[in-house]
Amino acid sequence: MLSIKDVYEKFDEIGCCSFATLDGNGGVDSRIAHFFAYDDEGLYLRTMTGKPFFRQMIEGGRLSVCGERTDAPVVWDDENMPHFQPGYMMRVSGSVRLLTDEELSVKAAANPMFAVATYDINKYPETVVLVMDSAWGELYDYDFNMVHRDHKILRERFSWGGATFVPAGFTITDECIECGACMDACTHKAIVAGTPYRILGERCDECGNCHHACPVGA
């Protein structure tokens, strides 16, 4: 499973990502931001107390972040079909809390990544630091045209701080009659023959082609 360090480094490669919060009125807000540090407790971000972003995190206590990294943008052919270059998407969702001044001082003394937060607080006194301390997420590595491998995706889910996750991918039940229809229908090469047939969750895009093709609904 990916460590918090691994997750941070993937997001850091992306740079700025979409940070979504509950707006307090039944809706969702999002904005572009980034994580600036990590440790064993979680991922760290900073904002200012006058911003809706701050209020929404304090009142709602939840945060969801996603971003994508690819070497080239999607291109469209003459039939308006998209062609994606290999890349990956990262997402993480969980709880977020405000660090006290004492906590921040201790972390800044031990971890040089917090220097930017100290600098910002000195320059903009309303700057605060929050930590995503309990969360789950997924690395979705894609190569839809199979440029570098013989299957389209690799998914890896992770969690920390007591959060849990549902493993990626569908499953095949014992009702399977081993006819192979699901394997023929799967364009992601996620199905392995056996008794019963088995779906590799890390390759499964949950498109539903296998269920659609199965004559017994297994």
Question: For each predicted feature, which ranges?
Answer:
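Short, structured beta-strand-loop surface elements
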Residues: 50-114, 124-127, 136
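A short, Trp-centered hydrophobic/proline-enriched beta-strand micro-motif
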Residues: 9-26, 63-67
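Short, active-site-adjacent segments that bind or coordinate small-molecule cofactors and metal centers
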Residues: 118-156
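Short active-site oxyanion
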Residues: 40-44
